[in-house]
Design a protein with these regions (language model features):
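Residue-level signal for well-ordered alpha-helical scaffold segments within enzymatic catalytic domains
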Residues: 26, 132-136
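Active-site alpha-helical elements of protease catalytic centers
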Residues: 120-133
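Conserved small/polar residues in nucleotide/adenosyl-binding loops
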Residues: 137-142
Length: 142
């Protein structure tokens, strides 16, 4: 990869690190374990809230978003060829909390340089990082 591009990406990450962490924390705070299906929330209230928050974050970054009947959603950035897509598939639901947590699993924290909380690595954190990567592309490419 171009060294100049690496430096630009590093600068973008440094400039946006605190907001990125806040966005991950906001998603982690949503208990998105599958719940009882109800009108407008086929997987329960928690997964619906996480979907809504994710689409809100994407829209705030200037991406076009679509909620597909509350089952899933997506954000997109128009490209030169509308027939071609690059997709990053993530999810924002989590499995039930198991034993061994020594702190609230829905309150993200940083410990010894690690992010801890339900979904930080599977898959809420990667979802937010993906949105920031697309946002960087949107802001920097012609």
């Amino acid at each position: 990869m171009d060294q100049g591009l690496n430096q630009k990406i590093d600068a973008y990450i440094a400039e946006n690190k605190e907001q990125l962490l806040q966005d991950i924390a906001a998603l982690v705070a949503i208990d998105s374990v599958e719940g009882t299906p109800e009108e407008g929330a086929p997987f329960g209230k928690g997964p619906r809230a996480a979907l809504d928050k994710t689409l809100e974050l994407a829209a705030g970054m200037g991406l076009a978003t679509r909620n597909c009947e509350n089952y899933m959603g997506y954000a997109e950035l128009a490209g030169a060829d509308p027939e071609k897509y690059l997709a990053a598939i993530c999810h924002v639901d989590v499995v039930p909390v198991g034993n061994g947590w020594t702190a609230d699993p829905f309150k993200m924290r940083i410990q010894d340089g690690w992010l801890l909380g339900r979904g930080v690595s599977d898959d809420k954190g990667p979802m937010v990082v993906t949105l920031y990567a697309v946002s960087y592309t949107h802001l920097t490419l012609p």
